[in-house]
C-alpha cells in the first residue's frame, strides 16, 4: 500500500556490484586458420580482461577460452572452448595471458577458418580476501616472480594504458 502512495519500501542499490564474469571477445576482420595469430588474439583479450578485473579489485580462479567458425558459411564448422583452472586466484596479466595461450594450444584444430575468439574470466573473488595455501612446490629457476611481485608492474601498465591508450 505504501508503494502505491509513492513511498519506497525497498532501497535501490545505485551502484551495481562487482561483475561475476569478465569477458573480452572479438570477431576477426578476416578468418584465421593458423595457431599463432589465434594465440596472439586471445593473449591480447586476456590482457584487456585482466585490466577490467583489476579495476574492480577482483581475482579470477578460472579462465575460459573459446573460438568458432562462421555458422553462415557452407564449409565445415568448428566451435571449441576450454576452461583453464588457475593455480592461484590472480589478476596478473602475464599469468592470464599464459593460461589463454595454453587453452588455445590445447583446443586448436587445424584446417578450419575461425572468425571469432574470446576469453572469459570466471569464478571471481574480491582481491582483499585471498586464502593462502601452503606451497610445497619449489619455484622454478626461470620463474622466480610471482603475481604478487608484479602487482606494481600491473598498476603501471594500467596507468600507461589509461594515459596513452591501448596498443
Task: Identify the function of each model-found stretch.
Residues 1-111:
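DNA-contacting surface of Y-family translesion DNA polymerases
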Residues 80-81, 85-167:
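Acidic, metal-coordinating catalytic segment for phosphate/diphosphate chemistry
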